[in-house]
Amino acid sequence: GYIVADQIEQDMISKDDNVLISRKAWKMEGSRMFIEVGKRVSVKDLLKGLVIQSGNDAAVALAEYVAGSEQIFVDVMNEYASVLGLRNTLFQNSTGLPDADHFTSVRDLAVLSRALIDEFPSHYDLYKEKEFTFNNIRQLNRNKLLWRDESVDGMKTGHTEAAGYCLIASAKRNDMRLVTVVAGSKSDKERFDASQRLLEYGFRFYAAQKLLEGNKELKSST
C-alpha cells in the first residue's frame, strides 16, 4: 500500500485509473477480492481489495499496473525498503506469500507502518473500513480489533504456515499513537489478544510529551 500511495501522491497514477486484470492476477491463490481476467478495475477498488480483503489478486494487479510486471515491482519494493531503512527486509513477491528468500522483521514492519501512517494519512483511512463488497461478494476486514477497540484504526493481518498468524495494529488515544506488531501466533484469536495486550500496556505505561514547540528558533549556546 505504501508504494501505491506514494505513486498517487506524485501523480504517477490516479485512484480513478482502470486496471486491466491479467490472468496471473486472476489466478492468485489465498485470500482474494475475486477480480476477473480481462475486466478493468479501478485503482481505488483494488486498494480496497488489498487493504480490506487482503486480496493477493489485488496485490498482483496493482504491482503490474505500477511497474509493468510483478518482478519489476518487487525491485521497486526493495528500493523503497532501502530508502526507508528497512535493514532486515528482502522482498521476492508483492503478496507476502511464502518464498525462501522473502523475509522481513517485526521492527521493519513497524517502521514501514509508521511511515505509511505519517506520510499518507488519507490513504491510511482505508485501513479502518470494516467491509468491502466487490462483484456482489461482501467481505469483512480481517482485523477484528476494529470491532473490539474503538481507538484502533488499522492496520493489517497476515497468515502463512511459516509465519503463523500475524497482525500489525495501530491505535490512537488522545494525542498518542501506538503501532504493534505480532507474529508467529498459533491462532487467529491469539494474535488479536496479544495485540490488545500490547496496546493496553503501551497506553498505560507510556505517555507522549512535547519537548519543543514547532517552528521556533532554539537559542544558541555561543
Predicted regions and their residues:
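Active-site-adjacent loops and short helices of periplasmic peptidoglycan-processing enzymes
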Residues: 1-107, 114-119
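Domain-terminus/edge residues, biased toward the C-terminal soluble/receptor-binding domains
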Residues: 86-87, 98-222
